[in-house]
Structure formats: C-alpha cells, structure tokens
Amino acid sequence: MKNLVILSGGFDPVHMGHVYMLEAASLIGEIVICLNNDDWLTRKKGKPFMSWIERATIVGNMKYVIDVLPM
C-alpha cells in the first residue's frame, strides 16, 4: 500500500513552485489536493484568478495527483 499525501492550497494560478512541491510530495506517496474554494480566495486576494473548476481540472490532471477535493 502506498502512502497518501494530502496537500491544501489555492493554486491560483498554478505555477512552477506548485509543480516542484508535487514532485517532492510524490516521493512520499500518492497525492490528494484539498483545493481552496473561490470564497476563500476572494477573502484572501480580492477575487480568484481562475475558478475552482478550472483550478481543479488543471491540478487534477497533474501527473502525481490522484484526487482533488473541495475545501
């Protein structure tokens, strides 16, 4: 059985730092992303750069990610 790594964040926008983090986390196990919702990003940044569904689609299609959950 593989280890499970749970990461959370806004990923708005997705950038190379996220890619490096996912590559490093993949050495530990399979990755599940808890993706911050648009309301959280609005409180933090004023408004999201990309919608939750856009961010979830991008992050969910990354090589090491097995699931994306709303947070």
Describe every region a protein language model picked out.
Residues 1-71:
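Nucleotidyltransferase catalytic core that binds NTPs
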